[in-house]
A protein has these predicted regions:
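Outer-membrane beta-barrel "beta-signal"
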Residues: 347-349, 382-388, 393-395, 407-421
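Detector for outer-membrane/organellar transmembrane beta-barrel domains
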Residues: 84, 181, 221-225, 247-364
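Transmembrane beta-barrel strands of outer-membrane/channel proteins
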Residues: 51-57, 89-95, 127-129, 184-188, ...
Length: 421
C-alpha cells in the first residue's frame, strides 16, 4: 500500500482543478446612487493584478518534512472594445522551489481568453477559452460538467478550486428574458482524444478540449424565491447526462440547496482503468444548508453522493487485490473532483472580522463514509487596503487506500502574502 503514497505526489499535483461583469455593473450602480450629485465617480478599472508569495512546510507520512517556496502573478482583464463587444483575459504564472536558493520551476496558465458580443439587450454570444462554472453546492458540484481536469491549484479549498482553474475553448450563445434564460455551449476537440479528467493529460488543451462535448441549460423563475436550472450535457461517444440545480430561502437566515446529475456512465474504477464494462444509470448529488448566524458567521452542512464510487469496504478490497489499478482510480477522482466513496460529508465555516477588524476565518472538514478518510483545512486571513496575510493549516487522516490517506503528505502549514493592484 505504500506505493499509493509514493505515487500520491502526482495525485496531489492533480488536485492543484459574464457573471463578474454583471456584478461589477450592479456595484457601480449602487455606488453612483449613494454618491452626492456633485461627487465625481471614478471609472471602473478594467484590470486586476495580484502578486502572491509564500512558504509551505509539509510533513510526510513517514515523519520526514519538506519546505517549499512559491511566487505567483495572477491577472485579469475585462476591457470593452466597443459598446457591444468586450474582451476577457485571465492568466496565472507560478514559480516554485524547494529552497530559496534552488532553481525555480515556472508554470503558466491561460485561465480565460474570450470575446463577448451582446447584439441585443437579451442576447449574448461568447467565443474563446471560457471558465464556465455551474452548481449551487459548496464542496461537490455534480452539474459542473467542465470541472474535470481543469484545476491548477494545490489548495483543497473549494472556493480556490473553482476560481483557479482552466476554462475550456467553446462557443456559447445565451438568450435571456425577465424570468429566465437558456444557453447552448459547444466545446470542440482540439487535442488527442482522451477522457476528461485523465491524469496523463500534460497540456492545457489536453486537459480541457480532448473530446467533443456540448451543454444545454435553461432556467425559469417559479414563484418568488424558486428558480431551478436544468442541464443536458453530452460527450462524444457517451450517453447524455442530465442535471438540476435548486436552492431557496428558508426563513431569513438559511439557504437550502440541492444539486443532482445523472445518466448512464461507468464506475470510477472502470473509467480510470479504461474498462467501462459496467455502464449503467448512475446519479451524483449534493444536498446542503447554509446558515448565517449573528456576528457574520456562516456555516454549511453538505451531504454528497456519487453513484460511480465504491461501497463500504470495496476500497480496501480493491487496494489489496490490485494496488496499481486502485491508485489509478484515486488519481482520477482528484482530477474529476469526485468523491471516491458512494457517500461523503462536508462542513464549511467562515467568519469575518473575528476578534479584530479585517481578520477572517475559513475552514472545512470533509469525510468519506465507509472508511476513516478525513481532511481538515483552516485559514486565518488578515485583510489590509492593498494586501492580505494568511496562515493556512491542512491535515489528512486515513489508511493508504483512502483518497486522503493516499496523498503524499499528512499535514501542511502555509504562510502567504497577497498584494492587490
Amino acid at each position: 500500500m505504500s506505493a499509493l503514497r509514493l505515487t500520491g505526489l502526482s495525485i496531489a499535483a492533480a488536485l492543484a482543478c459574464g457573471h463578474a461583469v454583471a456584478a461589477g455593473q450592479d456595484d457601480a450602480a449602487l455606488a453612483l446612487a449613494d454618491a452626492a450629485p456633485d461627487a465625481p465617480v471614478a471609472a471602473a478599472r478594467p484590470w486586476k493584478l495580484n502578486v502572491e508569495g509564500g512558504a509551505e512546510r509539509s510533513e510526510r507520512w513517514d515523519g520526514t518534512s519538506a519546505t517549499r517556496y512559491r511566487a505567483a502573478l495572477d491577472g485579469e482583464l475585462n476591457y470593452r472594445l466597443a459598446p457591444e463587444v468586450r474582451a476577457v483575459v485571465g492568466a496565472r504564472i507560478e514559480r516554485n522551489a524547494e529552497t530559496l536558493t534552488a532553481e525555480y520551476r515556472t508554470r503558466s496558465y491561460l485561465k480565460e481568453a474570450y470575446l463577448s458580443w451582446q447584439p441585443g439587450a437579451s442576447q449574448v454570444v461568447d467565443a474563446g477559452r471560457i471558465n464556465q462554472r455551474f452548481g449551487v453546492a459548496t464542496g461537490f458540484n455534480p452539474t459542473d460538467f467542465f470541472r474535470s481536469g481543469s484545476v491548477v491549484t494545490s489548495s483543497p479549498d473549494p472556493v480556490s478550486r473553482r476560481t483557479n482553474r482552466l476554462g475550456s475553448v467553446m462557443v456559447q450563445a445565451q438568450q435571456l428574458w425577465d424570468s429566465g434564460s437558456v444557453s447552448l455551449l459547444l466545446s470542440p476537440r482540439l487535442a488527442a482524444r482522451r477522457e476528461p479528467g485523465d491524469p496523463e493529460a500534460d497540456d492545457a488543451l489536453s486537459k480541457t478540449n480532448s473530446i467533443n462535448r456540448w451543454l444545454l441549460t435553461g432556467s425559469q423563475q417559479i414563484g418568488a424565491t424558486l428558480r431551478p436550472q436544468w442541464l443536458i450535457y453530452r460527450e462524444q461517444g457517451h450517453s447524455p447526462q442530465f442535471g438540476l440545480n435548486l436552492n431557496t430561502l428558508l426563513g431569513q437566515s438559511a439557504i437550502v440547496y440541492g444539486e443532482w446529475a445523472g445518466g448512464r456512465a461507468p464506475s470510477l474504477y472502470s473509467l480510470a482503468n479504461h474498462q467501462e464494462q459496467d455502464v449503467r444509470f448512475r446519479s451524483r448529488s449534493a444536498l446542503g444548508v447554509t446558515y448565517t448566524w449573528p456576528l457574520d458567521i456562516t456555516t454549511t452542512f453538505e451531504w454528497q453522493a456519487n453513484g460511480a464510487g465504491v461501497a463500504k469496504g470495496e476500497d480496501l478490497a480493491l487496494g489489496a487485490r490490485n494496488p496499481l489499478a486502485w491508485g489509478n482510480a484515486l488519481g482520477w477522482s482528484y482530477n474529476l473532483q469526485d468523491p471516491v466513496t458512494r457517500q461523503a460529508f462536508f462542513t464549511y465555516v467562515s467568519a469575518h472580522n473575528v476578534l479584530v477588524q479585517g481578520l477572517d476565518l475559513a475552514g472545512f472538514v470533509q469525510a468519506d463514509r465507509g472508511n476513516a478518510g478525513r481532511q481538515a483545512w483552516l485559514e486565518f486571513r488578515k485583510r489590509y487596503d492593498s494586501f492580505s496575510l494568511s496562515l493556512q493549516w491542512q491535515r489528512q487522516r486515513g489508511e493508504p487506500w483512502t483518497r486522503f490517506g493516499a496523498l503524499p503528505e499528512r499535514s501542511n502549514v502555509r504562510l502567504l502574502v497577497d498584494l492587490y493592484y
